[in-house]
Amino acid sequence: MKRGQVSLLSCREWYAVEMPRPPRADEAFGIYHALNRGNLRATVFHKEGDYVAFEKILGEGLERYQIELLCYQLMPNHYHLVLRPLLDGELSRFMKWIGGTHTMRYHAHYHTQGLGHVYQQRFKSFPIQCDEHFLVVCRYVERNALRAGLVDQAEQWRWGSLWRWLQKPEPTPKLLSAWPISRLPNWTQRVNEALNDKEMEAVRRCAHRGQPYGNDEWAESEARRMNLESTMRPRGRPKKLLIKQNPIKET
């Protein structure tokens, strides 16, 4: 390097040095919402065969890892999974395998090796309290296609757990595990009903930040226990305090 020349880190190198990854909750028997999106929000599932291929990968992953799939929905450019790992660290291992396997097969099918990433980043996740908050998240996930205007009724979306749950018996590959708590009565009708503004804002905030989703006491307790306190703090720089000064009188 010549004298006076500045060494510039690539964006990825800078991110690795300056922006350490936030902690992630990944404990056995916890319940987690996991999400990933196509790179630059690009379409990942272009046709029916793409959805079928991903569900096949999900089935393979569920056989390979000690983890349960409780709820899911595949959308054209992203997917939602609600999972319960049975071993510590199994959520991350499962999601890493799912993402890597799907990326490899996607590139092989579309002949796009070397043309960029399929997903925009590593998956996002947040822990969920196993009570009515779990049911809210499942309604949020299972009505995703309805909210996006892709169907008129949530149960019409073929690529998700609501449609699959309504089929008797469940089609192969078998993906869904029993829920830890009972569904609300008239579950399909409840999924078709919109979440209220408070519920929507809370779920989206937790998905964005990795913040535990539950009542205030549970969320704060879990954040402390799992070293997720940073997810509970307000984002952005603190506001500057404006100090009113008295004008100096000339003598």
Range-by-range predicted roles:
Residues 1-75, 84-251:
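Short Pro-Cys-Gly-centered "Cys-loop" motif that presents a nucleophilic cysteine in a tight turn
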